[in-house]
Amino acid sequence: MKIYVDADACPVKDVIIFEATKAEIPVTLVTSFSHYSNAEQPKGVETIYVDSGADAADYRIMQLAQKEDLIVTQDYGLASLALAKGCIVLHHKGYKYTNENIDQLLQTRYLSAMVRKSGKRTKGPKPFTAEDKEKFRALFKSMIAL
């Protein structure tokens, strides 16, 4: 198992790096050049930089990921592609994407886009909380223990 993180706006990178490093599982953070950092990562953690274009990180993750790898993303499109490839896919708020829930998530995203396109407003996501982080930590630890 390898872990790939759609890292541009991921609020749980610290949890992923800490837990994966303890378990000696390699982590690849995929992020745009606009988030470049000189920060040194622990052994087993690699950062890949991609162009800032739409979905560049998603495409790179899909090139790298193999069946049974673990991907952390908040992007439903990437989650759908990764599930089709046989990957385990987690959202940073602590839930697992599945073949049973991805269609509803994509449909909701589409309907919200149509509402916005018509000039109306939609609610954004709720703020990320400490409870969300702990929920993610518990799920992540259970997934890497498999």
From Swiss-Prot:
InterPro entries: UPF0178. Pfam families: DUF188 (PF02639). It comes from the Bacteria. Belongs to the UPF0178 family. This is UPF0178 protein BCE_3095. It comes from Bacillus cereus (strain ATCC 10987 / NRS 248).
